[in-house]
């Protein structure tokens, strides 16, 4: 199986996701979105979709660098701001992140990365409260399945248009949308520290894991069939473990059911009944 087998009709995907954003924003009673613009492909695609769906005047991009962030990331974020003629703000998170770790021993890169992600979430939700807009998420399907993200950090949002697209499909959609090649072709990175790379952290490429996840989820192939395709068993076992172990990250907090109608389980909110005018 080749990664090209995951390709979609990206014109149709664009139409579906644009309609999704317009409809969900209206259902929630809002008109505009705010998102963190990192300079990476995921946030660039979400920003492009939001502008096409809602108009440039209804999209605010927030750049949130840390002192170790690469200059290239900021340049690529600004490239999207100029391309789309949207409003933007910049909030440096270095001071609050560094202050959090003052006097705390046993610091690790993982913990600092989580605090950075949650500091950015705080900024976005404060802007959301200030301006009366919704926060758009930028986590793709591959990241969500693997749990490669921070709960109540970069995984926090009100709407996420790309959460059902594998990373390889996000790249395909980016090409369709005309996202600058510099953003599509560079190595994926959360830019948490100098030289950090998603694929180095994970130990495999997005193309490799997207094919495996597609076989597991979309094709519903069993272990024996997947291994017969030439997938190494240790790779299969590790990815499966990541998907299973991180299920809790993909759910709202689990509620113990006591009554006949429990929020988030079997009680439908009024907004779900509203007609879209």
Swiss-Prot record:
The kind of enzyme this is, by top-level EC class, is: ligase
Residue positions annotated to bind ATP are 36-43, 138, 167, 189
Which residues does Mg(2+) bind? Answer: 42, 143
Matches recorded under CDD domains: NAD_synthase (cd00553)
Q: Which Pfam families match?
A: NAD_synthase (PF02540)
Domain of life of the organism encoding this protein: Bacteria
Gene3D superfamilies for the chain = HUPs (3.40.50.620)
Q: Which residues form a coiled coil?
A: none
* Residues that hold deamido-NAD(+) according to the record: 118
Single GO cellular component term: cytoplasm
Enzyme Commission number, as recorded:
6.3.1.5
InterPro entries named among the record's database cross-references: NAD/GMP_synthase, NAD_synthase, NH(3)-dep_NAD(+)_synth, Rossmann-like_a/b/a_fold
| Presence of keyword Cell wall biogenesis/degradation | no
Per its UniProt record, what SUPFAM superfamilies does this chain match?
Adenine nucleotide alpha hydrolases-like
Q: What keywords are annotated for this sequence in UniProt?
A: ATP-binding, Ligase, Magnesium, Metal-binding, NAD, Nucleotide-binding
What is the reaction catalyzed?
Answer: deamido-NAD(+) + NH4(+) + ATP = AMP + diphosphate + NAD(+) + H(+)
What GO biological process terms are annotated to this protein in UniProt?
Answer: NAD biosynthetic process
How does this polypeptide assemble, per the annotation? Homodimer.
Q: Could you tell me what this protein does?
A: Catalyzes the ATP-dependent amidation of deamido-NAD to form NAD. Uses ammonia as a nitrogen source.
* Entry's family note: Belongs to the NAD synthetase family.
Q: Indicate what this protein is called per its UniProt record.
A: NH(3)-dependent NAD(+) synthetase
Task: Kindly list the organism's lineage.
Answer: Bacteria, Pseudomonadati, Chlorobiota, Chlorobiia, Chlorobiales
Annotated gene: nadE
